[in-house]
Amino acid sequence: MGGAAVLDWMVQDGVRLENCRHDHPLAVLGPQPDDQGWTVRVWMPEAQKVTLLLGSQEIVTSTPNHPWIFEASTPSDPGSNYKLRVERGGITTEQHDPWAFRHEWMGEMDRHLFAEGNHHHIWQRMGAHLTQIDGISGVMFCLWAPNALTASVLGDLNSWDGRHHPMQKRLGGIWELFVPGLDAGTLYKYEIRSQEGHCYQKADPYGFQHEVRPDNSSVVARLEGYSWSDSSWMQDRDSRNALDQPISVYEMHIGSWIHASADEPWIQPDGQPRAPVPAADMKPGARLLTYAELSDRLIPYVKERGFTHIELMPITEHPFDGSWGYQVTGWYAPTSRYGTPDEFRAFVDRCHAEGIGVIIDWVPGHFPKDAHGLAFFDGTHLYEHGDPRIGEHKEWGTLIFNYSRNEVRNFLVANLVFWFEQFHIDGIRVDAVASMLYRDYLRPDGEWLPNENGGRENTEAVRFLQQANHVLFQHYPGALSIAEESTTWPMVTQPTDMGGLGFNLKWNMGWMHDMLDYFELDPWFRQFHQNNITFSIWYTYTENFMLALSHDEVVHGKSHLLHKMPGDDWQKYANTRALLAYMWTHPGKKTIFMGMEFGQRAEWNVWGDLEWDLLNYEPHKGIQRLVDDLNVLYKAQPALWRDDFDQFGFQWIDCNDNRHSVISFMRRDSASGTWLVVVANFTPQSHANYRVGVPLEGFYEEIFNTDAAKYGGSNLGNMGGKPTDACGIHGYEHSLDLCLPPLSLVVFQHDPKRTLIESSAPSD
């Protein structure tokens, strides 16, 4: 190529670089071989002078082709270890040349697996990575934007001017750039220019940290370096059946559990105060707690209550507090509202040290339309379906992932592995699964597209959920994967190789609705609705169910649990205690939302915090004691959890006494052969001499009674237990003559060590 042609070519390249329209800067910039040896070309917008520092040499560059392309000749390949002295705006700096590093970060196998949708650790390639190339430290930026005309990195490193750092386009729609000299804490975004020339500034989809709202830039963060101390917990978790244990979950929203004063900032380990993150305006002067403060306050509280797990409503980064976290923009980052990624790791580590598992809500069903997020990412519908009839939740104002695209599924499946690997979480609850499974979910006729078979099922989402659960249990066999699925979709908790969705637990939404409908009734009318309280047993073994009284039931005018109950305050408290006790003795794992454990009165409001002052009142303290003791009883009695998903674990004694609204049943443990007798009276009328059949004669100790005085009850009961009578009823030859307190549930345990003679002898 002649000199004039080269000159013309370089002028065109300079114009393309200046206008952010060059997708292959490494073809022009950095060390380039030529007839005389090597030419180093440097792209340095608005610089007045650039000097090439090569060993002891200082070579002044020239700008023969474009005022921002600085060139210098060398007889041999300078490699990547040279530096540049840059004079710009009266300031002189020295730096390495980003375009001296030609290393391809995303390898051929990485691209192949990603294109297949099977790169389970794709975050180790995508995003912003602190690394070294040729001994030089910096950050490798890697982005997937296959339809973009160009992509650039902008941020603190270049005064937010996308012209400075154009990225190199690789195969498979990957863009890369190594920027030497950057460190953790650098703010950045990607500037993406569409084929039509429109410019979009996007946060990193694989960003590992983001700014505190309302700002939304990504932040360079270290993935490695935290020193975990939970190895024994992790080994034990993955060596056992995840369901063969008591599971009692405290569901909570970190930002509205309790607030602190903005006048009392958290003091960091370096002795400096952390800038407070304001809470919402319901409490002027309030700030959010940090992950570190939650470690000191929340974990001891949950441990004292006896819960086995904490479930965190979404802690992935999200811009709007009012979404409760369910409109995610930062999938690979814990929200910065409460601190740094390492501080969240320390929170999980501390939970494990105290014997508490951590479950997070995971939201792969939709994402928001925020301009800095995934929507219309590279000027096309990259992550979402283009047709709103399948790509948009109009009622929620959000977009739906295109599960048919391999790279999109890979983004989500790898995200699941990421949270377990990077943050040692123990489980997920997948939100709004029904919205994923049905194409006509919340859509009128004419506003949804049928599947390839003409049906309403979203077969793409089904395959995605199956893949996600298969991969999760392949990597973490002891994990919990919980579906919030509100329909009768079959085999939700069956393994994927049997055609199921692959979850190992499903929220029992039918039980929840039936229970709340029943307990909201005036007790006199409950006799006509006995089916509400008993129906769940007829289907409870069709799935692995978790009983949940969640946040969804205490918002939007539904009232909190206590205020759903009829009657005066005494009856409200008693009904609440009876419902919670029935929940704990019914087959299935347990979840309740924060505030229910002490009888919160007001609806949950994300802008406020819980009514902790209620614990100054004995009835609320009594409900808290009840929940504490329910968890103690639950964990101490394998009959209440070991056979949750086996019909052996439950046996009705009598479910037909609707006239008295009384039920009785046994919970049984196949391993030890032990059992418990549970009797519940769901009216305010107490019953003396109420007879219940039992399988063996002997003494039955009363081990739990919701009407105990310490819980706020009337303290009616059975004097510690009752011996059997040889009076047959309910198909048994022996029975107990019981006192049933009002609005109560009582639990008895057969004591084979106490004879009938001992139990009937007068006490001293």
Curated annotation (Swiss-Prot):
Family of this protein: Belongs to the glycosyl hydrolase 13 family. GlgB subfamily.
InterPro entries (UniProt xref): A-amylase/branching_C, Branching_enzy, GlgB, GlgB_N, GlgB_N_E_set_prok, Glyco_hydro_13_cat_dom, Glyco_hydro_13_N, Glyco_hydro_b
Keyword Transferase found: yes
Enzyme class, spelled out: transferase
Source organism (scientific name): Synechococcus sp. (strain CC9902)
Oligomer status and interactors: Monomer.
Matches recorded under SUPFAM superfamilies: (Trans)glycosidases, E set domains, Glycosyl hydrolase domain
Active-site residue list: D431, E484
Name of the protein: 1,4-alpha-glucan branching enzyme GlgB
Coiled coil (residue ranges): none
Protein's GO biological process: glycogen biosynthetic process
Pathway: Glycan biosynthesis; glycogen biosynthesis
GO molecular-function terms, A-Z: 1,4-alpha-glucan branching enzyme activity; cation binding; hydrolase activity, hydrolyzing O-glycosyl compounds
The keyword Transferase appears for this protein: yes
Keyword terms, alphabetized: Carbohydrate metabolism, Glycogen biosynthesis, Glycogen metabolism, Glycosyltransferase, Transferase
Reactions listed under catalytic activity: Transfers a segment of a (1->4)-alpha-D-glucan chain to a primary hydroxy group in a similar glucan chain
PANTHER family for this protein: 1,4-ALPHA-GLUCAN-BRANCHING ENZYME
Recorded GO CC terms: cytosol
Source species, domain of life: Bacteria
Free-text function comment from the UniProt entry: Catalyzes the formation of the alpha-1,6-glucosidic linkages in glycogen by scission of a 1,4-alpha-linked oligosaccharide from growing alpha-1,4-glucan chains and the subsequent attachment of the oligosaccharide to the alpha-1,6 position.
Gene behind this protein: glgB
EC numbers: 2.4.1.18
Pfam families on file: Alpha-amylase, Alpha-amylase_C, CBM_48, GlgB_N
